[in-house]
Amino acid sequence: LGGDIIGKLAVPIIREGSGGYRATLQGTTEHIDSEEGLKALLDRLGLLGFYHKIMTEEEFRTLAADQAAVDGLFHTLARQRLEAWIELANSRLGGTGIRCFVTGGNDDYPNVLEVMKTSGSQVFIDCEGAVANIDEDHTMISVGNSTLTPWKTPREVTDEELGRIIDGMIAQVSDLHRCIFNFHDPPNDSTLDTCPELDWTTDPPTPIVKAGQMVMHGAGSKSVRKAIETHQPMLGLHGHIHESSGAIKIGRTLCINPGSEYGEGILRGGVERVRASLKVTGLPAPPISTRWLPSGAPI
C-alpha cells in the first residue's frame, strides 16, 4: 500500500439540544434525528476516508478558535485511524504468511507515520527508508516524499534532495534488476504524472487556462525518472498524481500509477504477478504481468 495515508478532512458532528446532530459535509449541512442516521453518516465519512468528532456547540466554538487545538485533534484522529488499520491487519493477516508493505506520501505528517514504526506488527510493515525483502529473490525500496507542490505539504523536498534520498536507498541494493522502486512521485513526463498546470500565486492555486483549455504538464520527478532510466529496476510503483492512472514502460521497467478516486470512495490499485525464475547468475529478472479491469480501473 502506497500513497497519502492521512485523511483529507475531519468533520465535526455537533450534538444538538434536541437530541439530534448536525454536520456539514461537502458543502451541505445535514440534520440527523436518529442513531440510525448518525451511523449512516459515520459510514459515509469512513468510506471517504474522513475523520469525525462528536462535540457540543460550545466545544466546537472553543475548538474553532484555537488552530493549534484543531491541528492536535486532527493528528490524534489520524493516529487512531492508523492504529485501527494496523489492528485490522493483525487480526485478518496474522498467521497467514501474508505481509502488507505500507508507505506514506507527501501529505502525511511524520508524527502520524510514527505509529507504523512503533507498532511492532509482523504483517503491517513500514517499509520506507529500508530495503524490504519481498521474498528470497526480490527486494523493494520505498520513498514517500514528493517534489514541491503549491500546497506546501509536510513531506515535500526539492527534486535534487529527492534524488539524494533515492541514491542513498539504491546504494543499499545488491541486485537492482530484481528490485522494485516504490516511489510516491512518478517519473517526470511519463504520462503517469500529467495534470493541470497550476498558478501558485493564487489562494487556492488555480489551473492555468489558455485559449479556453486547461494547460496540462508533467508534474513528476526528474530524479525518479533518472533513477529508473539508469538502473532499470523490475517494477516502478507510483502515485501522487491522482488523475494520471496508467501503466507504461521506461526501458525494461514497467511503471504503474493506479490513480486515485478517494473523493468517490473508490480504492484503486493493481495486481502485479512476478513469474517464478531459476536462480542462475546473470539471468535477467523475471517478467511482470499486470491485470486490469475492462473499465481501465486496475484491480
Model-derived features with residue positions:
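Core catalytic region of metal-dependent phosphoesterases/phosphodiesterases
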Residues: L1-D135
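Active-site metal-binding loops of divalent metal-dependent hydrolases
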Residues: G3-G7, G105-D108, A130-V131, V143-T147, ...
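Active-site-proximal segments of metal-dependent phosphoesterases and phosphodiesterases across multiple
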Residues: A64-E83, I180-Q232
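Well-ordered, non-membrane alpha-helical segments in soluble/globular domains
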Residues: H75-A89, T158-G168, E272
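Conserved beta-sheet core of the metallophosphoesterase superfamily
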Residues: R99-V102, T118, Q122-V123, E128, ...
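Beta-strand-turn-beta hairpins that frame and shape the catalytic cleft
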Residues: V131-S142, L176-I180, I248-C255, G282-P287
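Binuclear metal-dependent hydrolase catalytic cores centered on His/Asp/Glu-rich metal-binding motifs
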Residues: E136-I180, D199-W200, M214-K222
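A short C-terminal boundary segment appended to hydrolase-like catalytic domains
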Residues: Q172-D175, T281-I299
